[in-house]
Amino acid sequence: IRDRNYIAALSKTVGLIGVIAVFAITSVMGQSDSKGLMDMRWKDVAVKMPEAWYASDEAKLMAENVLLTQKAIGGWEKNKPYHHPIDASTKAAYLKSKDKIGATFDNDATITELRFLANVYSKTKDERYKKAFDRGVDYILEAQYDNGGWPQFYPVRKGSVAYSGHITFNDDAMVNIMRFLKELLSDDPAFQSMQLSDSKKAKIQEAYDKGIACFLKTQIVVKGEPTAWCAQHDSVSLAPAKARSYELPSFSGSESVGIVLMLMEIENPSDEVKASINGAVKWFEEHSVGRLRIDTQTMPDGSKDRIVVEDKNAPLHWGRFYDLETEKIYFCDRDGIKKDSITEIGHERRNGYSWFTRAPEQMLEKYPEWKKRNGIN
């Protein structure tokens, strides 16, 4: 009943089918039965449902929301639950803001919606989905800088959030774009169904190649050796750049990993790509902050606080940020002042940000196999 009520509400919003027809729909997936679509994350609904589900009336109704919310320029806003019903006032607001800045690649936005449209189109052949998909791909190509990088938002925002115009590796924004472009040229059935023209495929390949070149150009070089990357780089100078007040120019212990993993996927890598990977791996091998346990303790007033404990049985950790001069881990409050210890910053930032990461583990685990595959001793 819950899912039927959900479908009826969504149907009323977009006007696709009548209430009688909607109530005739039965649940098509065990995941929906056990958890309910409303309780799922949009990104999971978009790409992780059983293949047959994308032909369902539920999927078609959600596709109406995705069509409605696409910006005129071709992208989408972030953190929107497009699998939830959209009421009349919210629908009106979306229509009114079609031309406003807000389309982004942050938090998997735009890429998630395009994957969903491809999944639904492959099952329904509704040409509206293909048209929206094509506009979205064109948006990605338009947003790319001549140097191969992508901003977090396009068009770029102004004022205090102008950092969204930097080439953005933060939260794997550019890596996600690059992976999507690579998949567009693959044998994936959903993307094959879009029947991209040869000219469009050529543009996608060119954008991907420029993106790889951008990764190589932005890698921080220390004493002639390639090391890691910053979470964002200036779109003109390519230098490490500042984002929010506590996200200073630095070596990134997290975002660098996604870049290296993507470079490792390149077949027959060039000497420059090999040097990039080798340099990054060496840097991470030398910059672990040790075996740590990140605990949360309850304070006398009932609040929670994060503490870091050295533990020889715990996994290796790396810092989120490393100083560009000293290459030592640092922490930072909203005042933008670097601190040597997490205990030196305020409770809000100490507990509201990920200051440590284990992301390099995956890269280091894949490195021996990558060397063997490419004949590197």
State what each model feature region is.
Residues 1-3:
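Conserved small/polar residues in nucleotide/adenosyl-binding loops
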Residues 14-26:
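Bacterial N-terminal signal peptides
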Residues 32-62, 179, 183-210, 236-243, ...:
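Terminal, non-catalytic domain-edge segments
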Residues 56, 60-111:
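N-terminal carbohydrate-binding/catalytic regions of secreted carbohydrate-active enzymes
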Residues 62-74, 132-149, 205-224, 276-293:
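Long, well-ordered core segments of solenoidal/helical folds
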Residues 69, 120, 143, 184-187, ...:
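Residue-level signature of the C-terminal ends
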Residues 82, 86-105, 149-169, 190, ...:
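A cross-kingdom feature marking solvent-exposed beta-strand/loop segments within repeated
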Residues 94-124, 132, 139:
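Long, hydrophobic/aromatic-enriched structural stretches that serve as scaffold segments
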